[in-house]
Amino acid sequence: MSPHEVIGTVPKNSTTFRTQADEHDDHEEALQNLRTGKYEDWPNEAAFDGLTEERGPIKIAVTGNIPTWAAGSLYRTGPGLYKIDTDAGTTFEMSHWFDGLAHTHRFDIIPNEEGSVDIFYSSRRQAEEMMDVIKKQGTWPYYSFGQKADPCLGFFAKAMAAFKGLREPSGEKWHNNVNVAVHVNPPGLEAVRNIVGTRKPAVAENDANVLGHRPELPKSIWVSTDNSTMKQIDPQTLEPIGWATQDVLHPELTGAMSCAHAQRDPDTGDFFNFNLEFGPKPTYRVFRVDASSGKTEILATIREPSVSPAYIHSLFLSPSFVILCIPTSHFGLSGTQIPWERNLVDAIKPYDPSRKTQWIVIDRKHSKGVVARFETDGRFFFHTVNSFEEKAGSDSSDINLYCDVIDFGSHEFIHSLYLDVILNRDSAAKKFYEDEQRARNSLAHLTRYHFIINPDSPTTNLPVTPTPDPKNHEAFRIPAPHAGEIPTINPLYATRKHRYVYSLPFRGRGTITDAIVKTDTVTREALFWDNPKGHTPGEAIFIPRPGGEEEDDGVLLSLVLDGEKGKSYLLCLDAKTMAEMGRAEVDFAIALGFHGAHVPSGRTLTRVEGPEY
């Protein structure tokens, strides 16, 4: 039997089971794949060129069995446009994957009369104003993640940009490229007084005509990125209808930077994030938006010479604490190098192995502010996984705090995400990965950090906890490909002790993620969905089965590019076995995006007591 034998109309993909004993060999094999150019036989160009929007909704073909309890709307966002023909007859091209112009997608999963589901797809571009400006000017007008600056931009233009700072004029907020994470009904932004620059939502009569039983829509959908701007989109039409900066939540949140992955308390719905203000005294303000009142409280203000402004993509939330982890990706000139370089990547200081990762633990229950600080070996990360707490012992008031994160040896990984490397233009991937240390630093690890918190600690002037051997803070570190990027867990286990992490590993077979893996953090076993060659998966979003009592009782939804055919499909995997249950195939390629959110229809997720691990 071939590993992809077709049973009925559903490809039966095999799974691969690996143990902790295989970690080293599998890691070295991934490095060998990079050295030998294994990725050259893994097509993914279709996800980066010739992409269009489909305002639809259109019905797409379903094969196999996607359970009816997965009904709802799956929203996904990410970059989707990389080339723009200008009025001058030239073509402007994005340099970095993260700078592709925003494109949001929706899959509506609707139970039908036959006991299965129908699936409808629609999508819409989110940065048409910026596209128009680029078309007219022939260049990128504002700050970016990694877009290479126009070489014709002179000293005076750079100096003026630095003088103006990072915040666009309010009339130009619509030009902001917001394309990373999806937030459903975030508190504090529902009131009209807090929404700046709103437009009137469009009316989508076609939705009702095509869908019949329209799925339940959320009150609001917002999209975020790594600055302090969020963009609102119509949950039905996907049209951009509003934007807001964090200062509408609190007047002190005036900094230009934040993180794309704010945290939500799974019980109260409270919203947590930070705001980063640059200048002579860079300042982090960690805040909470109360879900019941919509009011914002600043939990901690951190303005110290020893705490550098850094690129931070996500933060941690545990039952008692917000944990701000500051990796090695420090910005130069106290952050003011960003307007000089006009992008984040070039404004980050070169990697320095002597630079430590800083951990700042902030009380979120009793207004104590900063309650602990730690340092660990200098590493870089994009995505936190989860954070949970345990008592240190029956006779101790200390708290064991655990933080799971996908981290890297350095922030050089960011440079592997330039489109030249992803698409291996002029052998750029070969040139990047021929440096073995750089290749090693580009492979992810799932790391669990363990800290001991004394809840009776003073709230100010806390010393950094001495750490003669920073590795003492590591409970474990699981290397790629037994873990990978874009991690997810069962959402019912957020801020609780979890066992399973689902992620997209990098095995060196492609130039970006090339598999889906389920990692058991107790046994360190890894179970892979064995995708066919050239099938590049996106974020695996976990949908719990109603009434399920086991942590892995549910399904995973992942948008996959079939690079061989130049088409995409929505994949449904059994989260326990990693076997394919069904798929919904689209007759064209959909961009490789970043993150999404599933809005269930007809039910509310309920947290249950899970097993003890």
Swiss-Prot record:
Textual note on the cofactor: Binds 1 Fe(2+) ion per subunit.
Sorted UniProt keywords: Carotenoid biosynthesis, Cytoplasm, Dioxygenase, Iron, Metal-binding, Oxidoreductase
Compartments in which it is found: Cytoplasm, Cytosol
Main location: cytoplasm
Induction details: The expression is subject to photoinduction in a wc-1 and wc-2 dependent manner.
InterPro entries: Carotenoid_Oase
Changes seen on gene knockout: Impairs the production of neurosporaxanthin and leads to the accumulation of torulene.
Gene Ontology cellular component terms for the protein in this record: cytosol
Residues engaged in binding Fe(2+): H261, H313, H383, H595
Catalysed reaction, written as an equation: torulene + O2 = 4'-apo-beta-carotenal + 3-methyl-2-butenal
Organism this protein belongs to: Neurospora crassa (strain ATCC 24698 / 74-OR23-1A / CBS 708.71 / DSM 1257 / FGSC 987)
Residue ranges, annotated region (Disordered): 1-25
Any GO MF annotation of the entry: metal ion binding
EC number per UniProt: 1.13.11.59
One biological process term in Gene Ontology: carotene catabolic process
Protein name (Swiss-Prot/TrEMBL): Carotenoid dioxygenase
Classification lineage: Eukaryota, Fungi, Dikarya, Ascomycota, Pezizomycotina
Similarity comment: family membership: Belongs to the carotenoid oxygenase family.
